[in-house]
Amino acid sequence: MGATATDIEKVPSAGTPDEPKAGETNVYVDTEAEKSFVRKVDFFVLPMLCLMYFFDCMDRSNLANAKTDGLEEDINLKGNEYSLLILLFYIPFGLFDLPWNLLIKRYSARIMLSLRRYAVTVVWGICALCQCAANNFGGLLAIRIILGVFEAGFFAGSTFYFTLFYTRNEMGFRLAVLQSFAVLASAFSGLISFGLFQINHSAVKGWQWLFIVEGAMTLIIGVIGFWWLPDTAQSAWFLTQRERDAASARLLRDTSAEIETKLELKAAFQTWSDWKFPIWAVITFSYPVAYATAMNFFPIIVARLGYSVVKTNLWTVAPNLVGAVVLLVVAKSSDIFRERSLHIIFSLTVSLVGMLILASIDVSHNKGVSYFACFLLASGAYIPTCLVHAWHNNNNTNENSRAANTGFFVGLGNIAGVLSAATFRTEYAPKYVPTLVATCACNGVCILATAFMGTWMRLENRRKDKEQGARIVAGQVETRMLADGEKSPEWRYFL
């Protein structure tokens, strides 16, 4: 049994307090301690997770940079073997998200995220060295599959971990900050690649140095993370007791019906039979295709402009940096207005326009327009990753259910990377028009599904307002009062 509202100090009042009305609060939250708590979590927890995710993404996406330095020729890749290296990585990368997240709920994020990060560091370091000796498709494929197992679960686990500290209107921006480090990893991977590819060594190629150096850079951060991250706010070494009390109260006000609950599988899978679950599945499967296209194939797309290996890697930096800034701005707007669906649709539309331009013009004669389209793709492709998962978590007050749903939906999105990799076939080079068309189709499906879900939620909120004769929005009713979830009379969807 987790902590509930009865465990939290109530506001003093004369007589027996009535049940709180919409917009009122019975849970006392020390505002000064709350502000101090948020500042400390932003300072101690968020940066550590961002650094861990940065190196996580560096390891995952450097294959595209290595390709520009002659990886295919050096290990004799033939036909679609490069696409297979990416495609087969995404299978374990998607399948292991749910198990990792349930383990995080059972044993805490501090243990699972850090040990997983440390394990992948050791495994990747060993594999990087073995890769230098193997120099063949089979060896590299084995490395990618092992990497996929250990890389899985970090974003899903971090998303669930954030719900143990942040309220619903704080989630979007914090996830965007985390996601921006993935974008920065993609950008800096190009800069690091530029430097390492200049190393002239007869025995070790530039792309091999890339794997070795980026793998080694993750070791220290993985070890520190294990000792640095707290299990929950209640066990955080950097908080005072007053701040811990404020942390519990604020989560019961605007995140969870109960906190610090034990893992219960029945509760974890309780929403999987709901009719909306398949709609969420469509959304979380379709939006990541554009993200995977941008992350894994950006250097290849930019290479269509006809520049050298060095310039190709450098020219991927600017679109990613702009994409990171746009990501933070849109996510902050989403938190301020407590609105997700329209912001998601906006971002999907921006990346859709970019891909349509890339698919429809002759790149060799329209380099400026093509490069501008890369900026549009980067500006829109990264945003749904944080807002979609903030959205479905915002509409779920059960910790167990959030852990399972987030693991499944993030894993489903990771498997969607298979679609992106499968469509980047050598026979489609150099324009990759079928690839871009398929990605556009996925964006279109996601726009429709998101619009449907957002519209239905708005209509349902209005129906309840009409029945109860009062306009209530998500946030006015404390989540501690919503133990029955969507069946609670005062439930309102976070739009």
From Swiss-Prot:
InterPro entries: MFS (IPR011701), MFS_dom (IPR020846), MFS_trans_sf (IPR036259). It is found in: Cell membrane. GO terms for cellular component: membrane; plasma membrane. SUPFAM superfamilies: MFS general substrate transporter. The chain crosses the membrane at residues 36-55, 84-104, 123-143, 145-165, 177-197, 209-229, 282-302, 314-334, 341-361, 368-388, 404-424, 436-456. Its main location: membrane. Signal peptide: none annotated. Keywords: Cell membrane, Glycoprotein, Membrane, Transmembrane, Transmembrane helix, Transport. It is a multi-pass membrane protein. PANTHER family: MAJOR FACILITATOR-TYPE TRANSPORTER HXNP, PERMEASE-RELATED. Major facilitator-type transporter, part of the hnx cluster involved in the purine degradation. The nicotinate hydroxylase hnxS accepts nicotinate as a substrate and catalyzes the first step of nicotinate catabolism. The major facilitator-type transporters hxnP and hxnZ are probably involved in the uptake of nicotinate-derived metabolites, and the oxidoreductases hxnT and hxnY in the further metabolism of 6-OH nicotinic acid. Belongs to the major facilitator superfamily. This is Major facilitator-type transporter hxnP. The gene is hxnP.
